[in-house]
Amino acid sequence: MNQKQDNHGNNNHRDDNIDINSSIMFNNKNNVWVDDVMVSRCYNCKKKFSMLRRKHHCRNCGNIFCYNCANKFIVIPNFINDRPEPADYWNISYYITSLKDEAERVCDNCYYKVKEKTANSEKIANILKNPGSIVDISKLSVSYSDIKDHYYNHLRNIQYYLPNHVYSQIDKKIILANAKYFSKHSKYLVHLIKAIDWNTIKITDDKFDSPSVSIYKNRSQHKQKFLDHICEIIENPKKVSCQDLLCTRTCQEQLSFDDCINILYSKVQELPDSLLQYLFAIIELTPDDIIKNHAVLFVNIIKNNSNIFLEKLLYELLTKSEDMIYYIYWLLVISKEKADYQDITNIQRFIELLDKQLVVKMDREYRFYAGLIKHLNDPKDYLENIFDICDEISLPYNPSIKLTGVYTDQIRIKNSYTRPVIIAFETNVGRIDILFKKESVMNDLIVMNLISLCDVIIKENIGLELGIVVYPIMPLTNNFGMIEIIKNAETIHSIINQKKTVFQHIIDKNENKVISDIMKTYMYSLVSYTLHSYFIGLGDRHLENIMITDNGEIFHIDFGFILGTDAFPLTLTSDIKLNSGMLDVIGGRGSDRYKIYLDLCAKGVIILRKYFNMFFILLSQNSNYKINHIENFIMSRFQPRQHDTVVISELMTIIEKSHDAYTGIIRDFLHYHNQEKTLQNGMTKVLKEAYDVVKSFTNST
């Protein structure tokens, strides 16, 4: 998590004397090429693409144009450093680029901009060698308009850097030149704190207009004086307006919880104790459920931490309730599996701070689940008499619920690849069915945390209950986990097997309720279903991992494939599973409810895309995905530098293409026959018959 990487996810060994020319920025809105499947019209002339009007990527801005609007070629200099990368290898244009000579295809707008940037590159480089503040730059004459625009764009774009960004020397110079104006501008304060190498203070102190700093020859005095000045900037009143400082719409006067988490993500091990205390004072004000949704991050911090003061802050934050202590303890125990000696020492030191009697109890209960895992292939014998000889067992994700017995005659083994087991337990609150999976559920846990946070964010911003369905998930080891099964819910596959439509099923389950209320519940949940699909990139969507509650709430299960990955990548399906059966419930395409559904999806996009840092941080806690994969997905899906209308348009295109897409039908076919082994058996039969034919032909000759 703390490994420094550049914005392509690679280890960064940037030379401090980097050539200024290599930092000329173009103010591109895209970080990766726009995905082909998200666009149906030319970015410029808006004409619809067809078999005759084909798509062409501009190699400079990454947008998609028709031939007429992107038919210019120019050499794009290497010093333009914010060119978007191909989103993935499915873009045909990715391969065509390598067939071109030095001149590359660009749109009309980029053609003239590249020429202008090339002509002014030397002037820009001279300014960036020792950049002044935004106030100084604004005083330059009209003849410097391109240079001013470049400076403004660079400063503005700093606010969109991902949490893993490694700051160039030019980034640092521009940040420090403007530091005195950052008071009460939260997003700039985040990057001011993150741009400083707190271990060495390798920065130009005079940028702070504080000459007295240089007289402190003693390193600790120097560092303290420097820290005091940063604290002054944080606490000082606002000096310039958001408009004058080119702030984003998410700028606030005080750092938020998300801002603090962003700073901790990459700087937690080197921040001075006073800054840590300041950040944790803000984090302490956050509701427990949000803290719990970030528990995986805090556990990773504990695992890598050797700072006793930070350990104290973490202990105070994470031990406010027995529920939180249980949750953190279990995640810590699991994290030992992939830890070195120092990490295990750090984890154990934190556990020793907990109440000793409670630790003994949690350890005993952990051993119960560890024993169950060993016997999952045939759990009946293990569970038959276990509750006669041991005390009640707490659920790790909710210790107030105690397992008191088990329905051994109702244990079911599911017919899927890893053969997960469903066990029905007696508890102090009634029967609970738990699915034990023989694979990692860390993806599921992180996705469920994000879904829960999305619910909170939507409520806070528009006061709307979208009927998001969440359910407890708990890793037991790195290769096993437990998921509590939602009561009174069925998969769409099960509903269709009953010869019912989704609409009929919901009506049958709600005979005594007002139909319009039921339809509204379903519509709201369909909005959340759509937004989760889009912003998390849920893959492997088929009718057996989409469920509907008896109340009419539709929701996802099984998050083994996220970030646009899929079990059947060759189907090239869209990121959202929608069919006519799902849409008929709200009246189908063209209905009033369908229009409201689209409008709510658009509002959700505007709200959730502001939280791209939160998504990046939580998704990066799962080691199954490389950082550059997560980064490319976040930048292509959230597009933080783009206008809302562009991202909304792309989502609407996906929704439109999702209606009964043939690839979705193929996916359901492949999933069903893979589960039933009919496809495998059929192929075996075909191969056997082919072999018999060849054999008989050989014998006859």
From Swiss-Prot:
Residues the record lists as binding Zn(2+) 1: C42, C45, C66, C69
Keyword Ribonucleoprotein among UniProt keywords: no
Stretch list, region Activation loop: 556-579
EC numbers for this chain: 2.7.1.-
Domain of life: Viruses
Any one GO CC term of the record: phosphatidylinositol 3-kinase complex, class III, type I
Name by which UniProt lists this protein: Putative phosphatidylinositol kinase L615
Natural source organism: Acanthamoeba polyphaga mimivirus (APMV)
